[in-house]
Structures are given as structure tokens and as C-alpha cells.
């Protein structure tokens, strides 16, 4: 069944602030009433059921990444790979890029980063816990992931606050803005210039960091260009920074609203990875990803023409009662396994999934070791407004320090 946007009963608008506040009732209706949805005004299609989203991730032949994964019109060009790297490529270009990047972005490098993540978490917690109440996003979750990326790629300590501010500006959207706004464009250009200078510096003086490893990566004489490395570093800001910030805040928010489950995590820190996984399922940071239909595609007896935009909705898929029991219950420790689609699937499975999970585990563990309990100030919570990322711009909490 296809429901068109002219139907006043059901409208999916990824730019709508009411949708950002709580998309899940919309998703439920889409899964039940319009598993293939058409929005004429915004000119996109969408699939919401777990099976369809999973197949969409896995079928990189029928569904192309070549124009990127954002619905924002300015982002959907054949040049998207210049800022979104492999996320805006199809094979064989995607496979080449991913193979070369993987030579530097290794599981071992991520494992060896864990002590630095713990130290960065300690530094930010030392500052935040000077008071009993603070904004968890502004003082911790919004700082740590970008600082981890900066640590990984070799950004000096003195530049990290500036880089965090630029990363925030790249992603911010005002109410009603359905494209990349000029301030985000300007921040993107400044960030790319900074990374170009960083790459040039490490080409002259290699160091023990990811940027130098990417410069050295080689496969049968093939190497990454400076432009390709720059695009990958920028991708980490988009795909690795913001999503992890939102994961941390989402975990803290939802556990606070399920105090019995939070108490079990406080009592047994081995449950922290389960806390992370259930948050990834229940309220994933990455809610909506776009694909371009590579050739006429038939779903639910409806033909989607070549060149059309099809949105995959992992935020909906993770709440599909066809796959998960009681999906609207936040239940730390539930069996999730390979059913999770928060990191995608197939050829484009998120290269940074292990980094995000490690960061969240380390950061939340560091927090719980420093406090006895916390509460969220619900009256002053502010959500971020983005067409594809879900989380909090401000999450004020009060804590009981140990």
C-alpha cells in the first residue's frame, strides 16, 4: 500500500519539529498502513518495516549511494563523495576506498585508543562534576566524541574546542529549514580547510595517528589522495561525532526514565554494553538514510522510477513488532543480536560501529563510577532538529556524586 502526502491522515516530514519530538507513532502507522510511503511535496519514497529496511541496506545494486545519504537537496549531487567519502560511493569505487581506509582504521587501532577515551572522559567529567547539576550534552556527550576523533586523527589539544564548534555548526538546522543552511556551508568549508592543512602537516612529518596511517595505506601501488583522506576525515565528523553524542545522551535519558533498569546497571557494570545496545535499538541516533533508485524498482505492487529518492528508516525498523517482542518497551538485556539495523547492513555497514560501541561503553562506565545516581530535568530538555539524526541539544541532569 502506498499513502501519498495529500492524505491528511498520515504525513512523514523529516524536517518537522513535531516529528523530531517523537517519530515513533508516525513510524508505527507507516509500518501498518503504508509500508511504502510517498511524499509528493518533498519528493521522496520511504520504507519502514524491518524486512524492507534491511533489504534496502543490503541491495546496493538496486539502491545507489552515489548521491549521498541525506535528503537535503544541496547534499544530493554527483559530487557528494567529496565531503561524504565512501558513504556517497557505489562499488567498485566504494570497495577500493573502504579497503584502503581499513588499512589504517583497524580494530587494533580502536582497541589501543581505549585508554585515551577513558582519560578524555575523566577530564570532561572532572569539569562537569564541579557542580551537582549540568548539561550532559554541553559538558560531556557533546565534547567527548569529537575529541576522540581529534585524538584519533592527530588534532592538537589547542585546536579541539574550535573543531568541536565547527562540527556542531555543520550539523545544526533551524526550524523549517529543509536544506543545508549558509552557516553550515561556511563551517564545512572551514573544517575542510583545517583538515587539508592537517594532512599536509602529517605528509611532511608522519606521526602515530590515523591521518598518517591513511597517508601510508597502499594496495598494489594504489594510495589515497589528499582529497580522499580529507573527505573521510569530514565523514567522521558527520557519521562518527554527532551520532555518538546522541547515543550517549539517549542512553542517559532513557535509563533515567526506567529507574529500575538503571539501578541494575549501577549495581552491575557488566550490563553497560547491554544498555548501549538497547539504546541503539530503542532510540537510534541515525534515523533516516537516503538511497537513489538505480533502476525501476517494484515494491508493494508499486513501481518506483529510476532516479527517485527512497528513504530507509532504521529508527522504525528497530521498533517493528514483526521482529522484536514488545518493541516500544525499553528493556536493557533483551535479545537483539543481528536484528539491529542502527549501523546498517551489507557493503555499507558502518565502519565505525566498533568505535561507537567502545566509546559509549567507556564513557557510560566512567560516568557511573563517579556518581551514585542522577535525574533528568525534563522541563528543560531540548531536542536537536535534524532531518536524519535524533537526540538532544541540551540534556540537563542533576547528579549525586560518590
Curated annotation (Swiss-Prot):
Heme binds at residue 350. Its EC number is 1.14.-.-. InterPro entries: Cyt_P450, Cyt_P450_B, Cyt_P450_CS, Cyt_P450_sf. It holds the Pfam family p450. CDD domains: CYP130-like (cd11078). Its cofactor is heme. It is an enzyme of class 1 (oxidoreductase). The keyword Glycoprotein does not apply. GO terms for cellular component: plasma membrane. Keywords: Heme, Iron, Metal-binding, Monooxygenase, Oxidoreductase. One of its GO terms (molecular function) is cholest-4-en-3-one 26-monooxygenase activity. GO terms for biological process: cholesterol catabolic process. Belongs to the cytochrome P450 family. This is Putative cytochrome P450 123. It comes from Mycobacterium tuberculosis (strain ATCC 25618 / H37Rv).
Amino acid at each position: 500500500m502506498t499513502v501519498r502526502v495529500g492524505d491528511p491522515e498520515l504525513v512523514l516530514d523529516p524536517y518537522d519539529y513535531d516529528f523530531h519530538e517523537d517519530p515513533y507513532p508516525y513510524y508505527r502507522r507507516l509500518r501498518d498502513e503504508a509500508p511504502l510511503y510517498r511524499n509528493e511535496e518533498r519528493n521522496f519514497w520511504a520504507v519502514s518495516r524491518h524486512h524492507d529496511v534491511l533489504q534496502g541496506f543490503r541491495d546496493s545494486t538496486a539502491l545507489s549511494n552515489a548521491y549521498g545519504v541525506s535528503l537535503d537537496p544541496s547534499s544530493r549531487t554527483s559530487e557528494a563523495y567529496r565531503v561524504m567519502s565512501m558513504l556517497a560511493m557505489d562499488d567498485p569505487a566504494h570497495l577500493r576506498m573502504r579497503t584502503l581506509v581499513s588499512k589504517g582504521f583497524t580494530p587494533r587501532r580502536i582497541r589501543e585508543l581505549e585508554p585515551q577515551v577513558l582519560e578524555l572522559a575523566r577530564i570532561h567529567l572532572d569539569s562537569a562534576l564541579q557542580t551537582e547539576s549540568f548539561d550532559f550534552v554541553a559538558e560531556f556527550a557533546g565534547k567527548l566524541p569529537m575529541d576522540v576523533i581529534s585524538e584519533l586523527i592527530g588534532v592538537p589539544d589547542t585546536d579541539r574546542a574550535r573543531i568541536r564548534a565547527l562540527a556542531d555548526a555543520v550539523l545544526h538546522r533551524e526550524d523549517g529549514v529543509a536544506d543545508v543552511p549558509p552557516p553550515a556551508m561556511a563551517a564545512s568549508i572551514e573544517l575542510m580547510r583545517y583538515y587539508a592543512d592537517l594532512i599536509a602537516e602529517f605528509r611532511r612529518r608522519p606521526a602515530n595517528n590515523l591521518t598518517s596511517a591513511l597517508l601510508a595505506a597502499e594496495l598494489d601501488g594504489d594510495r589515497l589522495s589528499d582529497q580522499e583522506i580529507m573527505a573521510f576525515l569530514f565523514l567522521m565528523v558527520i557519521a562518527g561525532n554527532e551520532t555518538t553524542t546522541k547515543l550517549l545522551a539517549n542512553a542517559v535519558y532513557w535509563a533515567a526514565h526506567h529507574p529500575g533498569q538503571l539501578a541494575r546497571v549501577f549495581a552491575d557494570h557488566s550490563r553497560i554494553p547491554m544498555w548501549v545496545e538497547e539504546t541503539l535499538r530503542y532510540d537510534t541516533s541515525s534515523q533516516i538514510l537516503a538511497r537513489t533508485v538505480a533502476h525501476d524498482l517494484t515494491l508493494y505492487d508499486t513501481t518506483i522510477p529510476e532516479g527517485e529518492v527512497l528513504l530507509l528508516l532504521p529508527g522504525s525498523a528497530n521498533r517493528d513488532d514483526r521482529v522484536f517482542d514488545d518493541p516500544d518497551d525499553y528493556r536493557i538485556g533483551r535479545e537483539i543480536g543481528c536484528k539491529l539495523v542502527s549501523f546498517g547492513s551489507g557493503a555499507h555497514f558502518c565502519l565505525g560501529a566498533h568505535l561507537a560501541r567502545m566509546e559509549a561503553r567507556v564513557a557510560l562506565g566512567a560516568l557511573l563510577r563517579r556518581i551514585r545516581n542522577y535525574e533528568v530535568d525534563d522541563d528543560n530538555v531540548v531536542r536537536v532538529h535534524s532531518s536524519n539524526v535524533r537526540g538532544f541539544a541540551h540534556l540537563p541532569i542533576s547528579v549525586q556524586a560518590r
